[in-house]
Amino acid sequence: MDEDAGARGTRASGPSLTGSTPNQTSLSPDSVAAAPQRARLHAMGLTSAQMARPFVGVVTSWNEASPGNIALARQAQAVKRGVRDAGGTPREFTTIGGSDSGVSGISSLISRDLIADSIEAMVRAHGYAALVGLAGCGTSLAAMMMAMARLDLPSVIMFGGAALPGRYLDRDITLQDVYEAVGAHAAGTISDDDLRAIETAACPSAGAGAGQFSANTMASVSEAIGLAVPGSAGLPAPYDARDDFAHKAGLTVMDLLDRDIRPRDILTGQAFENAASIVAASGGAACAALHLPAIAHECGIDFDLTAIGYVWRRTPRLADLRPGGTFLVRDLHDAGGTPALMRAMLNAGALHGSCLTVTGNSIAENLQQVEVPTGHDVIRSSDQQADRFRVRLYVLQGNLAPDGAVMTGDDMVSQRFLGRARCFDSEAAACAVVAHCGYEEGDVFVIRHQGPKGGPGMLSVGAVAAALSG
C-alpha cells in the first residue's frame, strides 16, 4: 500500500464533554483535601496501597439484552486480573449496548454516540489513567474506539467474541439462516416445524453473529487498526482462551501506560486505511463505512467515504466468509484467525506494515512469525484466485446518491440493470410484501427514510434481503 497517508492524529482535536482529565495524584495520603474521596474508596474495599496505583477503567457493554453482550462480565474479570498483575487498580463500569439486529431504528446509531459520550464522562469524572473496553456488537465496538480516540489515554479494545454456529440437517447455520427461513416459510418451501427447528438451533452459544456481520467486522477493524491485542478478535465467545486474551489486555494497557503510548499515536491515516482494507479483504459489513469516519473524526483525521472506496477498490478479497461466502468466524479462527488473514493481506501489499499497535510493535513485527496455513479454503493468498469470492463492497456515486452510497453484492460484470422499483417507507412494509410473496423476479426493493435522520438511527434492513434470499 502507499506510504503517504500516515498523518498522526492530533491530541488537541476531537470533541469533548469537559476539560482535561483530573489527576489521580489528588488521592495521595498526603492530600488532606482528598480525605473524603479516599473515604469513599475505602467503603469499596480499596487499601491505601491500591489508591496509590494507577486507576484503570474497565468498561463493558454487558447486559442481558443480547447474546453478544452476555459474556462480557466474565471476560472483564480476567482483564482486571491483568491490570492488578501489572501494578494497576482496575475500576469496572458498564455502559449501554443494544444489538444491531435486535433494536428499533431509533436506537442503533444513536446508541453509538451515547456510549462514546458516557465513557468519556465517566473516565474524566473519575480521573482514570487508562482504559480497557469490552464490547459485543459493531456499534459498541465503534463507540468505544471513538471514546478512546477522544480521551487519548492509553487504551485497549477487546471484542467479546463470536457465537458458535448451530447445526441443522448436518450443516452449520447462523442467525442469517433464520432470516432466510422466514422468507422460505413465506414462499411455502419449508413448514412451521422446519422454521421452529431452525430458530431453536441457530444460536447455541453466547457471542455475536457467527459470520462476518457487523460485530465481527468491527472486531477485525479493532485488530487491524492497532487497538486490540493481536489474535483476540476472532476467538469465539465460549472458548476459555478468551480469558487469556482478556488477561493479556489488562497487562497490555499497563505497558502502554508505562510507555505513554496513546490511541492517537496508533490511529494514523494509514491505520484507518488498514482498517478499511480488512473490511474488504474479509468480505465484511458495510457498517464500517459509517463507523470509520466517526472514529477518524475523533482524531482530527478526514477519512471519508471516498477514501474508504479507494481502499476497497484496491484490496483483494482474501477470506471466504459468510454472509457472502462459505465459512464462519469459527472456521477463520481454526485457520489462524485474524493474524493469518492480516499476514495474507501483508503479503498481498494490502496493509501498511509500519503502523504502530498496542503491543508497542508494528503490524509487520507482530506478524513476523505468523504464517497463512495451507490445506483449507478459508483464507487465500492473492495469487490463488482470491478474486473468485463473490461478494464485494463498493462505494458508488451518482445522481441517486451525490454524496456516495455503499453497495454489497456480486462482482459487477455488467454496469447496467433494469428492473421495476418497489418503493417502501419502512422495513416492516417491505417485509409484509415478502411475507405474501407480492413481488416478481427482477423487482428492485427500495426502502426509503432509513438513514441517520429518516429512521432515525440508521436501521439495518438486512432482514429483508435475507428473507428474499430464502
What is each residue range found by the language model?
Residues R8-R11:
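Basic polycationic patches enriched in arginine
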Residues V123-M144, V156-F159:
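A short, small-residue-rich loop immediately preceding and capping a beta-strand
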Residues I115:
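Active-site glycine-rich loop that binds ribose-phosphate moieties when present
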Residues D2, G14-E64, G68-I70, Q75-I96, ...:
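Catalytic or ion-coupling anion/metal-binding cores of large enzyme and transporter domains
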